[in-house]
Amino acid sequence: MSLIRVNRFGPRGGARKTLKVKKKAAVRQEWDNTVNDLTVHRATPEDLVRRHEMHKSKNRALVHWELQEKALKRKWKKQKPETSSIEKRKLSIMKEILSDQYQTQDVLEKSDHLLTAAKGLFVDVPRKRTGFPNVTMAPGSSRSPAGINQDPGTQSILNESIIEPQALNEVDDGGAESTAHSQSEDSESELPNSLSPHSNRNTERFLHQLKEENSELINQLWTDIQQKIAAQSQRTPPGSPSSELSAEDQKGALNATDAVKRIQAGLQPEESAEPVDSSYVGQVLNTRKPKPLLSKVKRKQDMRALSKQKKNMLSSSTTSADLASSNNSSLDVLKHMIHEVEHEMEEYERWTGREVKGLQGGQGLTGFTLSLVSSLCRLVRYLKESETQLRKEVETRQQLEQMLGDHRELIDALTAEILLLREENGAVQARLQQYMVTTDEQLISLTHAIKSCPVINNSRQESQAPERAAMGRRLVDNVGAPVVNSNVSMPLMLKGEEMVDFPQEELPVKLSQGPPPTENLNLASNFPTHIFEPAVMLTPPRQKSNSEFSPLQDVLRRTVQTRPAPRIPPTVEVIEKEQTWEKKNLPIDPDIQNSSEESRLFTQRWRVSHMGDDLENKSQPQFVSLSQPPQFVSLSQPPCSSPPSTQQSRNPVFSEEPTVLGDGQQLGTADALMHRKDIMARIAELTLQNSAMKAHLNNITSSGGEHGDGLREPSRQGNASEVPANFPAVQSLMPSSMEERIAELNRQSMEARSKLLQLIEQQKLVGLTLSSSPVSPVESPLRAWTEEGKRTIEVSVPGVEASESSKCNTVSPVSGVSSRRSSGAISNSCSPLNATSGSGKFTPVNPRTKQTEKQSEEGWFALSAHLP
């Protein structure tokens, strides 16, 4: 059986297959805006403009100005640079103005934000407003919204500024009505204070809500008032006082302020028999008071109808009461008030001391007005006077305060100055004390120094110019014989002046008081004791007594110490050659040696005494220490002298130096005989001294000749020729006059002292020669040798110009030996050593080159430093 597959759903048979028909898609409906219309949220054109302005850039003007400036710069680049800068100034001014304006706006906005967020220090600054929340109550809820915590200070100020709270408490029947009025007035009084549009919208909403909420309460209060008025009108006729009292009680309660109560309290004791009711006060003072209340209520249209009805009723009752009682009580009340005012004015006038005016009695309104106006005028006048007086007092007080400030500043300045003066005074006193202490110390040290120094008379007498010239001529005439300088100081006994003390710094010769160097101490320890016997004390005496000296030595010591030094010529350089020691051992005649020694002693005394005067001129600050043997320079003048044409010798001219011839030139004619006797006595005393000195000199010479035999040289003839050239010539110059005799005696005493000093120095040199080595008897560690075996010794001799001596001059061998031996000692002293050439030269301080030939003719001796 065969199975055939057949379409199950298809028609049987060979029928045609049918096609499905597609359904059309449902058309989508448009948006239905009828339910929620969103076009109300679309911004209006005004909002769009406002938003557009809000989002504009604030720097638009600045950008515009910058663009203009760039354009101007481009324009200026194209144009010449000499164009005016007016446009640039305009742009700078615009920029300054605009920037200041924008900065001011920013500052104002910032300050506004700060003020809104700031919390005021006082109650009303910034003003605080009472907020009224917009709360929607539930439909079935009778509870009011939650209470708002109000500021009590602001609330009390607002209540007092609008209406008196005591008046509200005194209301009996119309309390609710008064509260309603107070609320309405409170809300109305706050309206003008809100100036912004947002606050206006909020107040409108609040009033609308308040109207809806309180409409029932207001209607109820209004019906109660109408019922009471109707009941009172039924009981009494319209003109009865009860209706007036009932209507006026409310007005009196509303207007019973503190001022009215004070006036009423002042009138009650005077009119205790006739008490004044509050209704009269309200009639007199507040007859037209309801009109401002009505004008306040008319500000809002929502409350207009109810307020009109209520105020019309009140005003009608008030006017009816005024018409009834104005004729009875108004004049009495005014009289009492005027009397009270006048009484107060009289008391014020008495209190201030002004003239008291009597009461002006007047009947009717005319007298009342006159008294009131006069009282007001007086009050105003008194007020002006008090104000003027107050201003004067204020000005006076300001002046006094200014004066007080000035006085305080002066007091402060004086106090500071006094303190400064005190400090300065203390500092000055401290410096004075210190200065006194130092001065005392200096005085003490000066006193000790003066006590330790010898007494020296440094006063020198100077003769007149003609006398100096005459003495110079006399000296020039005696060229062949040696002449002693006339400027030799006289002994102390020949002068009538007082002795003058000099400190150590002003002594003619620097006296060495310090300890000797170690080398000299070692040398002195090897010498015999008889060499250091006391002779002439050129240093201050160290012994406790003068018993160790002989009388002659004591006289000689005092004479040497008290003699001032005369002035001598400038620097002399003595250059000596080193000689062999074989010539020193040859014998020499004692007479020739004495003559040469006298010449050297005079030169040494002359040089040493004149070196001290050089310290005063401060030309050569070199000192000769007398504690060591000085350098001797032989002063000799042979008979034969070279002519000035062949050799230019510089000899000193003593006529330029001041001569001291004695006291005889300064005596008057009246006392001539007395002074001459004194001079003769002095001459005799000097003669005795010279004889004693010569005797002592002969003894010392004989003893010194025994020790000095090894030092003599075989040049007796030269010195023998010098002896008759020196001393006989001196003896031939004895003048006959008194002054010349005094000078001659003075010269002889000086020569004797010089010889004595020379012999003492020779004894010391002999001891040094015997104890020294055979190669160099006295060898100084400070000698300066030249290449040729010569040494240079520089001696300061101020005031003399000298050169090399003439070729005919003969040099004393003993003087040469003495100068060579003493060179080592001078090298240890203050005289400088200078290694120069072998030839001797003299360097004068004040050269006189133009007078060379004249000086060579007039000179009487020459400084000879040549050694054979």
Curated annotation (Swiss-Prot):
This protein's superkingdom? Eukaryota
- Carrying Phosphoserine, the residues are S240, S655, S772, S773, S776, S831
**Compositionally biased, Polar residues: which spans?**
190-200, 229-245
Pfam families attached to this UniProt entry: SPICE (PF15678)
Give the start-end ranges of region Disordered: 129-154, 172-201, 229-250, 291-326, 630-664, 702-722, 805-868
Where does the record place a coiled coil?
Answer: 381-434, 736-764
Q: Quick one: where is this thing mainly located?
A: cytoplasm
Q: Which residues carry this modification: Phosphothreonine?
A: T236
Which UniProt keywords are given for this protein, alphabetically ordered?
Cell cycle, Cell division, Coiled coil, Cytoplasm, Cytoskeleton, Mitosis, Phosphoprotein
Q: Which GO terms describe its cellular component?
A: centriole; centrosome; cytoplasm; spindle
Q: Where in the sequence does UniProt note compositional bias of the Basic and acidic residues kind?
A: 706-715
> GO BP, one example?
mitotic spindle assembly
Ranges annotated as biased composition (Low complexity): 315-326, 634-649, 812-831
User: Which cellular compartments is it found in?
Assistant: Cytoplasm, Cytoskeleton, Microtubule organizing center, Centrosome, Centriole; Cytoplasm, Cytoskeleton, Spindle
What function does this protein fulfil?
Answer: Regulator required for centriole duplication, for proper bipolar spindle formation and chromosome congression in mitosis.
Subunit relationships? Interacts with CEP120.
The name on file for this protein is Spindle and centriole-associated protein 1
Q: Could you tell me which species this protein originates from?
A: Rattus norvegicus
